[in-house]
Amino acid sequence: CSGLSTCALMKLSQDLHRFNSYPRTNVGAGTP
């Protein structure tokens, strides 16, 4: 990671994608 902010953002993004994987919200499942 080049910067802490970038690292945190990337981790957050991964977590968000993980949550989107679950059939919790149709909106999340619709977006790649």
UniProtKB/Swiss-Prot annotation:
Localisation per UniProt entry: Secreted
GO cellular component, one term: extracellular region
Residues annotated with Proline amide modification: 32
GO MF annotation list: hormone activity
Disulfide topology: 1-7
Main location: secreted
Keywords: Amidation, Disulfide bond, Hormone, Secreted
Domain of life: Eukaryota
Recorded family membership: Belongs to the calcitonin family.
Function: Causes a rapid but short-lived drop in the level of calcium and phosphate in blood by promoting the incorporation of those ions in the bones.
Protein name in UniProt: Calcitonin
Source species: Aquarana catesbeiana
